[in-house]
């Protein structure tokens, strides 16, 4: 109950908090691999998926953070966009994704998975990993970091993919290019 507003209006006013406002989404983009036509195509699609997802989440009022092992063309550092919110952040987000370069020998993406530690409700963090990498070791590492949280892995592919076994509570979405 908002007592100050109730007193001003003379009628009971209750603040409602939408569940989506408490949700935070971390989008992690893996840009390892360059030079092979299929890898380049899949990395480009991965950027498109990650950026579009972030924009839609921001427009829905959800707080977003985005990280990638892809190097920023200006700083030479891995792309990092700590928590942003609101439609006013869309331009900065699009610029960050546009400046992330795919390359060989990048830092392993596992180092960019959020831990969720230090948050009041660690279950309020949803992590979405966008990667063309279909190795089981990567999927296992992501599931291990997720713990009991339901996280999502999006795998862009071309022509065919090999269905991986389910690991933990991570859901996997195969995205045909």
Question: Can you annotate each of these PLM segments?
Answer:
Residues 1-177:
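Exposed, interaction-prone extracellular/peripheral surfaces
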